[in-house]
């Protein structure tokens, strides 16, 4: 009987948290991006590794976003699923083509799981009011491997 009471309380708590979460989120809070490309080791730039990444962003304003990221990367024939906390800043230069800076810090799950960080930048090419084409490049560092990778990505950003 006690277990049933705990389950009811947990269900009520979940419902309240769900309602509060969607009550305070602005209408344009569902901003997503998806990117794909390559990530090459800095020491051997000619060896290509596939890299796919995406983010769910929460807009602070039109120029700054915080969010969570994840994806799939294959680095030196080892598959990883990176999960990260992320920051995106559009620089106030231009109207249709905006330079951006991005940073991620997180954990790579895989055979050689480890912490990682990435820093990069690129271009946010406005497609319309709610979408953009992304061209991104940057540096990614793996903690246990003690080496860096250069990544090049292209993708799309959708602000709903």
Where are these regions (language model features)?
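Cleavable N-terminal export/targeting peptides
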Residues: 1-31
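Extracellular loop and loop/strand-boundary signature of outer-membrane beta-barrel proteins
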Residues: 39-40, 72-73, 106-108, 140-143
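Conserved beta-strand segments that form the floor/walls of ligand-binding pockets within enzyme
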Residues: 33, 102, 136
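Predominantly the C-terminal beta-signal and adjacent terminal strand-loop region
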Residues: 97-98, 119-160
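Short glycine/proline- and aromatic-enriched beta-strand/turn motifs that initiate or cap beta-hairpins
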Residues: 27-74, 153-159
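Gram-negative (and chloroplast) outer-membrane scaffold detector with strong preference
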Residues: 53-133
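Short, solvent-exposed loop/turn segments at secondary-structure boundaries
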Residues: 44-46, 78, 111-114, 145-147
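Short hydrophobic/aromatic beta-strand or adjacent loop that forms the aromatic wall/cage
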Residues: 49-51, 80-84, 149-153
């Amino acid at each position: 009987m006690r277990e049933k009471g705990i389950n009811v309380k947990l269900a009520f708590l979940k419902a309240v948290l769900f309602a509060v979460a969607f009550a305070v989120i602005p209408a344009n809070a569902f901003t997503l991006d998806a990117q794909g490309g390559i990530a090459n080791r800095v020491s051997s730039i000619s060896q290509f590794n596939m890299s796919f990444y995406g983010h769910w962003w929460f807009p602070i304003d039109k120029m700054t976003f915080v969010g969570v990221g994840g994806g799939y990367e294959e680095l030196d024939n080892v598959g990883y699923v990176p999960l990260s906390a992320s920051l995106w800043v559009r620089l106030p230069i231009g109207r249709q083509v905006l330079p951006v800076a991005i940073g991620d810090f997180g954990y790579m799950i895989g055979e050689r799981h480890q912490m990682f960080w990435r820093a990069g930048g690129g271009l946010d090419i406005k497609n319309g009011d709610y979408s953009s084409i992304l061209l991104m490049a940057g540096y990614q560092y793996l903690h246990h491997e003690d080496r860096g990778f250069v990544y090049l990505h292209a993708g799309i950003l959708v602000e709903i």
